[in-house]
């Protein structure tokens, strides 16, 4: 039996975030196009070289991107919206689609399945000419071959997943458009095969959640492609879950290899193989190392998996690989020497995961005795972290055991609470607010860096934060906002900030992963039991409230978002970790309330993204996710108004869950998705406070008052004005002051115009 090592994708951002810095330098005209392309090529080839040096045999080519791999595919296939037709150069068109411009609205951005990565949503328009506009995978394949002598494995997004992720067509049009994709995919694969590509990875993550009819439709497309490209060696790659429900049909697809996730879809995929076997004429690519988390693998467990598979699989070949692209993990743990030994030893970032693949390959080809020392080391590491005091806190266990049913609900129903809140808060019809953060200017970031490096004192840093807070309180008053925020100038990241102040968390120095475009985040590490230590937001929020007669919102990140945006310990269920976080936040919320804060926002932008891919698994997740939010927020008085915020979600799937959160007000991203949630509300009712975002904060353009008024007008057709709020899509941290102030002025004016119209029509 031939066994090879393979990788599905490598992190793009560079060990020191060189990729991010190059992008932003190009966008700000600090480097020209030639310099940009040269530097990007250097980064791209360096990533290939690292994988080569680590001993990976099938190295992914084409996973590298200037922004997003789905956007790459859209451009490659000619899915370019007509509003960008005035742009002529590749990069101008590409980045206009991704980011928008002064006069052009960007394409929508949303979450990549149930991860924290965002992709640009492809747009289909009537009359679109679908063709292979640019064979980028071929260029990159030839580049790696010529520059490094690497005969790589081209990676492309499959036609079915691509079109399922796209928007702009009716369901009736889907089959027709899908057939139109056959020709460009045939050309793409033919040219790669002709250039010498030995194996081509075709990613179809959507296959984990298809109906029987969709599977048959997908199979017909692959049969049409295979008919035209009979000799290309295709690896049909699935990930993020099992394909158990349709496995029997999948293994008959006309491809040479099938990649399955044996981490996040282990039970389902093993059940399917046990029941139906695996074709002897196909290669099984075994996703055995977790590509979405940062913990060392349990090598004994992985080797047991292969023992099981080798008994049930008749194929002559196997591929050892991660469960998915390593895009979702930091690059290398070697710089994290500040961590405790027990935690550092338990980690495995992308480069360490590549080393684990090679270890497994050695054990499978040379016997386990060839890695006996490494196996012993791994066993000791796992024993140490499992028995750690941080993972066995008696106070946390006692608090969990003591929970009662009444801890998960507010005393009064929403309608009665809202009446009391209106009396207490005295807000106008259609109140205006922002989502929480204001621009983190160069000065803010530089001052924080100086403080962290000990260049300025705690007192100097606190004075600076107070100065920024007061400045933006005054801005908000002048603009005319109704509910203000303190601006979050003390926070780098909405999750990292809390991780640094709760027991059970740790944080890395260089554990960056890509979120969207050049935006990178450094997820905290939940390694132990989570517990409250001291107040986390009290000082800044109370100070902001002391500066104004207007209401100031307390700002917290919710338990499910903290969970979903962290690297989470894998020794207990995620539900239990979420409840631990909720109990800690409950304490903080009670402190805010007792300090005089009457509106408290608990953001849950990641609630939807944590949902399992399969609908049959949704209810269990939604139940504990909602319970976590209720546990955090239900101990406040009826007069205290609880807000929450969500973004980047397919909300139609979770309207009932949103309702069950029982938040007094929810703000939701609306403008970037071109009013999608407004359409959802046409078919259901939402009888609580709601704010539908009136402008896209991810684009530098300042929308006009009329644009925002139009969204307000559309929203009021499906929302009760009595409960309607007006706000941006998301926080304003990444925008510049000169963009934020006029945009908020336009928003407030749109609100005033809407109020006037409502009064006139009353």
Swiss-Prot record:
GO terms for biological process: methionine biosynthetic process; methylation. It comes from Bacillus thuringiensis subsp. konkukian (strain 97-27). GO terms for molecular function: 5-methyltetrahydropteroyltriglutamate-homocysteine S-methyltransferase activity; zinc ion binding. Its cofactor is Zn(2+). The active site is at residue 698. It catalyses: 5-methyltetrahydropteroyltri-L-glutamate + L-homocysteine = tetrahydropteroyltri-L-glutamate + L-methionine. This is 5-methyltetrahydropteroyltriglutamate--homocysteine methyltransferase. The keyword Acetylation does not apply. L-methionine binds at residues 435-437, 488, 603. Belongs to the vitamin-B12 independent methionine synthase family. Binds 1 zinc ion per subunit. Its EC number is 2.1.1.14. It is an enzyme of class 2 (transferase).
């Amino acid at each position: 039996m031939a066994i090879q090592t393979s990788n599905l994708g490598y992190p793009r951002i560079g060990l020191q975030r060189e990729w991010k810095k190059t992008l932003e330098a190009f966008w700000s005209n600090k480097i020209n196009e030639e310099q940009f392309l040269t530097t990007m090529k250097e980064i791209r080839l360096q990533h290939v070289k690292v994988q080569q040096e680590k001993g990976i045999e099938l190295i992914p080519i084409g996973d590298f991107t200037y922004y997003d791999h789905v956007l790459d595919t859209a451009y490659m296939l000619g899915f370019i919206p007509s509003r960008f037709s005035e742009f002529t150069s590749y990069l101008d068109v590409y980045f206009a689609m991704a980011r928008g411009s002064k006069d052009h609205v960007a394409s929508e951005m949303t979450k990549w399945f149930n991860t924290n990565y965002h992709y640009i949503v492809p747009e289909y328009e009537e009359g679109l000419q679908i063709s292979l506009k640019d064979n980028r995978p071929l260029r990159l394949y030839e580049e790696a071959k010529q520059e490094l002598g690497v005969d790589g494995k081209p990676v492309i997004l499959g036609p079915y997943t691509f079109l399922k992720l796209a928007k702009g067509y009716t369901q009736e049009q889907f089959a027709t458009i899908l057939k139109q994709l056959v020709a460009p995919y045939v050309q793409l694969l033919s040219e790669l095969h002709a250039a010498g590509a030995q194996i081509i990875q075709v990613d179809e993550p959507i296959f984990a959640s298809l109906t029987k009819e969709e599977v048959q439709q997908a199979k017909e497309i692959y049969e049409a492609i295979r008919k035209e490209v009979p000799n290309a060696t295709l690896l049909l790659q699935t990930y993020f879950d099992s394909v158990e429900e349709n496995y029997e049909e999948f293994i008959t697809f006309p491809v040479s290899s099938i990649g399955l996730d044996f981490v996040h879809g282990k039970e389902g995929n093993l059940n399917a193989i046990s029941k139906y076997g695996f074709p002897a004429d196909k290669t099984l690519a075994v996703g055995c190392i977790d590509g979405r988390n940062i913990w060392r693998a349990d090598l004994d467990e992985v080797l047991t998996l292969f023992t099981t598979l080798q008994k049930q699989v008749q194929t002559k070949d196997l591929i050892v690989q991660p469960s998915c692209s390593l895009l979702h993990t930091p690059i290398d743990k070697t710089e994290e020497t500040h961590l405790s030994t027990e935690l550092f030893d338990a980690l495995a970032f992308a480069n360490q995961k590549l080393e684990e693949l090679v270890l497994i390959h050695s054990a499978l080809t040379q016997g386990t005795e060839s890695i006996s020392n490494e196996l012993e080391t791994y066993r000791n590491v796992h024993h140490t972290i499992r028995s750690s005091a941080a993972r066995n806190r008696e106070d946390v266990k006692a608090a969990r055991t003591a929970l009662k049913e009444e801890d998960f609900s507010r005393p009064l129903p929403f309608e009665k609470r809202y009446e009391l809140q209106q009396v207490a808060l005295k807000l106008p019809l259609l109140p205006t607010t922002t989502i929480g953060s204001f621009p983190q200017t160069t000065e803010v970031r530089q001052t924080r860096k100086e403080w962290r490096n000990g260049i300025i004192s705690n007192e100097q840093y606190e004075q600076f934060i107070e100065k920024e807070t007061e400045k933006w309180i005054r801005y908000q008053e002048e603009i005319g906002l109704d509910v203000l925020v303190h601006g979050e100038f003390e926070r780098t990241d909405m999750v990292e900030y809390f991780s640094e102040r709760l027991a059970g968390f740790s944080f890395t120095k260089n554990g960056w992963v890509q979120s969207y475009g050049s935006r990178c985040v450094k997820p905290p590490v939940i390694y132990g039991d989570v517990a409250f230590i001291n107040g986390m937001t009290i000082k800044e929020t109370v100070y902001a409230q002391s500066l104004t007669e207007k209401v100031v919102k307390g700002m917290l990140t919710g338990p499910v978002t903290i969970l979903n945006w962290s690297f989470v310990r894998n020794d207990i269920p995620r539900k239990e970790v979420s409840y631990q976080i909720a109990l800690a936040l409950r304490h903080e919320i009670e402190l805010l309330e007792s300090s005089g804060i009457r509106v408290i926002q608990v953001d849950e932008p990641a609630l939807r993204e944590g949902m399992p891919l399969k609908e049959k698994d949704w209810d269990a997740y939604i139940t504990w996710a909602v319970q976590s939010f209720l546990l955090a927020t239900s101990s406040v008085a009826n007069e205290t108004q609880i807000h929450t915020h969500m973004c980047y979600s397919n909300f139609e799937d979770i309207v009932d869950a949103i309702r069950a959160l029982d938040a007094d007000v929810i703000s939701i991203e609306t403008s970037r998705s071109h009013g999608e949630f407004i359409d959802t509300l046409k078919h259901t009712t939402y009888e609580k406070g709601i704010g539908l975002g009136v402008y896209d904060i991810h684009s530098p353009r300042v929308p006009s008052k009329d644009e925002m008024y139009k969204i307000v007008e559309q929203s009021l057709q499906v929302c009760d004005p009595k409960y309607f709020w007006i706000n941006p899509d998301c926080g304003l941290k990444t925008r510049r002051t000169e963009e934020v102030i006029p945009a908020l002025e336009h928003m407030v004016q749109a609100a005033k115009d809407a109020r006037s119209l409502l009064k006139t029509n009353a």
